[in-house]
Amino acid sequence: SGMLEKRHKMVAIYNAGIDSLNADLDAYHQVKYLNHMGPDHCSSHHLYLVRLSGRSREEVNHVIGQMAERGIATNVHYKPLPMMTAYKAYGFDIADFPNAYHLFENEVTLPLNTKMSMEDVEYVVENFVEIVKGL
């Protein structure tokens, strides 16, 4: 459908921008993204999650804040349950779930919706690249 084709194009723009960024980063600080397509699979491109390898939650929050200052709303998906108020009230402690925290600590989700133009996607990835290079 037209919507899925548009999402494919948007993801391709993001991937190209991040691949270019990674060429300038050391191996420890590579930005990882979910491979949405392969010979045996193709996702709906519902979310565009990236992992800022080797970065702390504070550094990721800095990126999120800088993106917001430029009018770009990012998000953090899949916050670990032990970090949510209801679970804390039952005594869950994120320190007991280091793998969950590790997956959360350097993740950010870039905007990906069909109301965006290709120019919007370019704006997002250009700013993301600039901000991450500044870390």
Predicted regions and their residues:
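PLP-dependent aminotransferase class I/II
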Residues: 1-135
